[in-house]
């Protein structure tokens, strides 16, 4: 399953579900025939949410969830193609525009990662829960912003990212885009994510 944001020629956008038999593809739309420009014959594939940055999370019990821009979230259907019920808003310690969400789980703790601000002012913050992917989140002890600009390393505006977990080494790698100084270059950076004894993320 691949959850992809597409912006059509008429500037309408959404997150779509694509599927493949192999992780390296080829991927096809899970439903419908594709996306078509206005005036072009064809029936559009339906979006799973009418917004960007759809990010799936599958819990240990097999239940799936989708998180997307503006802190919205919902449970996924069993076939992973639709959301169930009305979306809810994730509760976070910091307010303001947010996109690029991420959910992951480590040692029984759920981590909800979200961006704040934008452009060269992007930062990444997080919340923690021991309850469920959709509830019980609290601000971590210490600094809840774990990634921010580092001009000394020429890193400006670390934004939307994701986790790569290496089972062999038990390492968590956070990969993210870097906006750039003054104009976007969308470079990709990677940082090792380390944790304190209480599960909080080291900054």
Regions inferred by a protein language model and the residue ranges of each:
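Carbohydrate-active catalytic/glycan-binding domains of CAZyme proteins
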Residues: 1-203
